[in-house]
Amino acid sequence: MDKLAIVILNWNGVRMLQKYLPTVLQYSRDEATVYVADNASTDFSLELLHTRYREEVRVIELDKNWGFAEGYNKALQQVDATYYLLLNSDIEVTHHWLTPLIEFMDAHQNVAACQPKLLSVYHRDNFEYAGASGGFLDRYGYPFCRGRIFDTVECDNGQYDTVQDVLWATGAALMIRAKDYWDAGGLDGRFFAHNEEIDLCWRLRIRGRRVCCVPDSFVYHVGGGTLPKSNPMKTYLNFRNNLTMLYKCLPDDELHHVMRMRWFLDYLAAFEMLILKRNWGDFRAVFRARRAFKHWRKDFEADRQQIQSTRQTAQIAERRTFSLLWQYYVKGRKRFSELP
């Protein structure tokens, strides 16, 4: 058994592998076994892996594009390790990036998962959207980070360099105990992509396990590798999966109120996209997401019952009680440090 397995999920990402895999190997090979799980790529990814990296990388070939969530589930079933580190192919790692993560996990057995600090490849003094310095949720399920709220991304001045318990750690660079991963049920493959790591981390927190950001470790992220922000499918998956996650994970006494408010807020967002941004694609995507959630919600009733049966605490501090929309748009609080 390996102590740590870095698993990079790839689909037609040969350019990212060519650019960033050498650095992963350079700065990780002494502390981890590196795997690339390929989601049935049709580019030259497998040719590259089997020729240039055949001695350094273990390749897992999947039979089709299973997406991010189920792709990782399929791949990790074939990996025997104490810790998994799920790593995007568009991550540039840094010297000694693994040491703080490993030492922290070894020293804190009640921590199920952690992440490094995530900075932008293109603006290297800025946090990166997908996880920054650790993730939180507001009362209504809107995610935000230390260093990023909605589209406001902060400059990294060391203001969030303390280890912090969080609600969720980024799926771009997620270190997790294998036992916790499978005990919690893994990533929800039905999500395909988007919100899946938040859903998993919330389930871990419900079970009484901790999730942390360890900013002594930092990496650089390109971002937008699954779907570009302008793609309506990204909007669809984000809304559908976020609603599904809320249905699965909300406490019983909050479920009705939060889901009712989200009905109002989602349609408000849709019309804002249409009227102010003239974005027909995203407008339709929100309506499609609401319909999809309505139709498949019944498929998650058993999931909800099982998750609630594992609940160790009614309230999780990193799921904040305020409305992020109110704080951001009405109060003008656009930095994490300004939030109540």
Task: Give the predicted meaning of each segment.
Residues 61-79, 89, 100:
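Glycine-rich, basic loop-to-helix element that forms the pyrophosphate-binding segment
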Residues 31-40, 60-62:
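Short beta-strand/loop segment that forms part of the nucleotide-sugar
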